[in-house]
């Protein structure tokens, strides 16, 4: 399959002042976040590279060349990825269109044993030695679990893992997003750890439900009258049911040394490709002069609403409401 250029879609809420420059439905490749353990990005020659699939629970170990993988029937999926080190309100989350091969096809060709056994691990290795893993059944539960060869219609850039990388919806990258991949092994879950577990990060890494205010930017000044507020929320594989915003007088919050829970109201959500992507949201606010504190929270499609209590990113992802302050004149 040859790369096909993709015209990135226009966001439903791009009319919000400043939003399109900060967040779009599909993240341009050059703007997609980068977090790696590799100080120097591996330069892989696709003519000599291969991907091997093996392990204790594989009956027929197999390997594939880059050309063999490109010549297969490829699928295209839109998936949001995020980093476990992303703080509340942070920008280490992006959305792209990925093209590649479902890993289940490759595992089945290798004769994987008992794919529903949660004591078996999908364990991957990069050419630079990075390793990570997740429970094998997650590759088979219907989520996008892909060996990606293209990103937004073009071959993977070197920075994003050329010639191939993993894209697993709903898992933080530290347990799933192996770039420059060279090996997939089906191993035991217990006793086989990836790069980050000895360094204090959790063995499992499901993405937590999150939301963010992108505009107006915290600390900015806006004119009174109609002000459009916008941002994103995400809970890949589960999906976002509702996003709410609370806007309070900053002086009252300071005087009470607490927030009120009386001001939450739902916002408008944009359409999404699937539950594996982030969703843009907007709220039109009749702003009056003063200093205002904004908070946002999301509820996913299981009915779970974000916790207001701050939790640091380590060891398994940040929690809390993204909070901003703006001045209206």
Which residue ranges define each predicted feature?
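Structured, non-membrane catalytic/scaffold regions adjacent to prosthetic-group chemistry
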Residues: 2-329
């Amino acid at each position: 399959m040859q790369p096909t250029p993709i015209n990135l879609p226009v966001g439903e809420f791009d009319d919000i002042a400043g939003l399109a420059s900060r967040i779009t439905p599909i993240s341009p490749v050059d703007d997609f976040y980068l977090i790696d353990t590799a100080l120097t990005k591996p330069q892989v020659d696709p003519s000599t590279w291969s991907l091997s699939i093996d392990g204790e629970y594989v009956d027929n170990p197999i390997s594939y060349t880059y050309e063999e993988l490109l010549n297969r029937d490829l699928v295209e999926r839109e998936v949001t990825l995020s980093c476990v080190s992303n703080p509340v309100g942070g920008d280490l989350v992006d959305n792209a269109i990925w093209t590649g091969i479902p890993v289940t096809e490759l595992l089945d060709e290798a004769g994987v044993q008992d794919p529903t056994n949660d004591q078996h691990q999908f364990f991957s290795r990069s050419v630079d030695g990075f390793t990570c893993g997740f429970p094998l059944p997650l590759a088979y539960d219907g989520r996008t679990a892909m060996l990606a060869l293209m990103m937004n219609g073009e071959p993977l850039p070197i920075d994003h893992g050329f010639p191939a990388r993993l894209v697993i919806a709903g898992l933080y990258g530290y347990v799933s997003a192996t770039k420059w991949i060279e090996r997939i092994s089906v191993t035991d879950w217990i006793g086989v750890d990836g790069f980050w577990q000895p360094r204090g990060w959790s063995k499992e890494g499901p993405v937590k439900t999150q939301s963010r205010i992108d505009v107006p930017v915290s600390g900015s000044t806006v004119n009174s009258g109609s002000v459009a507020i916008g941002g994103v929320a995400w809970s890949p594989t589960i999906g976002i049911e509702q996003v709410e915003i609370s806007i309070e007088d900053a002086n009252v919050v300071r005087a009470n040394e607490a927030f009120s829970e009386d001001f939450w109201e739902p916002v408008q959500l944009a359409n999404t490709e699937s539950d594996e992507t982030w969703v843009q949201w907007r709220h039109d606010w009749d702003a009056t002069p003063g200093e205002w504190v904004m908070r946002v929270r999301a509820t996913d499609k299981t009915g779970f609403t974000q916790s207001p209590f701050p939790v640091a990113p380590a060891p398994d992802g940040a929690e809390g409401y993204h909070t901003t302050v703006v001045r209206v004149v």
